[in-house]
Amino acid sequence: MEKIIKKLKIMIVEDEEDILILYKDFLSGKGHDVTTTYLDGEDMIEEIDKVKSDIYLIDYRLPGNKNGIEVAIEILNKFPAAPILFITAYENLQKEISKNPVFYDKNVQVLLKPVKLDKIENAMVNLVNKNRIK
């Protein structure tokens, strides 16, 4: 199947500011619209109704009261078809997701850090395209 690459609207939550800036600069440079970025999951949750996004990039370990899984659950409760890409150093995240019924039949993928930036863009495009096919 041919990849359809379009300008994606992206929300990112990543607690390491240098990594957040790296993702934003890379994805913006590829023509995507990084609509909003957050250093903490609670801030992202407060804004998800205000900003339309095609995909959500989420780290697992976040400051505050919510980790990445909890942020993703909040997003999926509001937007059940939302594509979610976890980018994390937490090696057991895939196991945790696979045990949680909230994520069954959802469009979710995990990439482990360190990850090449091109791999992030490819995963995003695949998740968004998968959503279109459903």
What do the PLM-derived regions correspond to, one by one?
Residues E16-T36, G41, V108:
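Two-component/phosphorelay signaling modules centered on CheY-like receiver
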Residues I69-P80, N100-P101:
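Short amphipathic alpha-helix used as the core "switch/output" element in two-component signaling
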Residues D59-R61:
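Active-site residues of response regulator receiver
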Residues M1-M11, E17, K116-K134:
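Non-catalytic signal-transmission and effector/linker regions of two-component phosphorelay proteins
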